Amino acid sequence: MDQQDHGQSGAMNYGTNPYQTNPMSTTAATVAGGAAQPGQLAFHQIHQQQQQQQLAQQLQAFWENQFKEIEKTTDFKNHSLPLARIKKIMKADEDVRMISAEAPVVFARACEMFILELTLRSWNHTEENKRRTLQKNDIAAAVTRTDIFDFLVDIVPREDLRDEVLGSIPRGTVPEAAAAGYPYGYLPAGTAPIGNPGMVMGNPGGAYPPNPYMGQPMWQQQAPDQPDQEN
């Protein structure tokens, strides 16, 4: 029975999500699932699957259009992003000596596609929450839900990451006391994580040294010396 469920889960993830899900958001869903009611959890999972399928279709259509536009491009002088600024950023690397004229053009197109994809993923989170204005927490959601965007975790405000992870948990599934201390990755500075920290701001939990286990001292009770009794 376990093998069958495992196979179905793997097929669903492969077919609905083009990228691997970030462990941070996966942990939140797992913890929520443990305390959720069966009916509420099933509805939440179905809704998430529909959102993932819709996003996968949008991403596929997006990249198909991008490839077609690249093949049809003939004007390499006009760009959405300033080439001078891109070239200045490239020169910030001390190891870079010379930059060809074509390199900033390629970077400009790559940055444009990166912004478009991140916006598409962020807008999906906006519609998921039935809003019409894209907010910074939507960008945080796109970052935490996409494995290839892990390098952006450090520049996204922690409050937005925390709200995104807690917002993915169905209401009434986690007690208030547990929600206040979850997830481990967003504890204030100087606070030691409780239990297994998992992922902490995109870094493995090993960034915090585990507290060593201190066993209880075993004291041997020595019997008081008794004077020898003369027979």
From Swiss-Prot:
Chain segments carrying region Disordered: 211-231
Quaternary structure, per UniProt, is: Heterotrimeric transcription factor composed of three components, NF-YA, NF-YB and NF-YC. Interacts with NFYA2, NFYB2, CO and RGA. Interacts with REF6 (via N-terminus).
Q: A Gene Ontology molecular-function term?
A: DNA-binding transcription factor activity
Q: Where in the cell is it found?
A: Nucleus
Where in the body, by tissue, does this protein show up?
A: Ubiquitous. Present in etiolated seedlings.
Q: What is its main location?
A: nucleus
The domain of life is: Eukaryota
A Pfam match is Histone
Q: Which CDD domains does its entry note? A: HFD_NFYC-like
UniProt key word Metal-binding? no
GO cellular component labels: cytoplasm; extracellular region; nucleus
Q: Which family does it belong to?
A: Belongs to the NFYC/HAP5 subunit family.
Q: Which GO terms describe its biological process?
A: abscisic acid-activated signaling pathway; gibberellic acid mediated signaling pathway; positive regulation of photomorphogenesis; regulation of seed germination
Q: What is this protein called?
A: Nuclear transcription factor Y subunit C-9
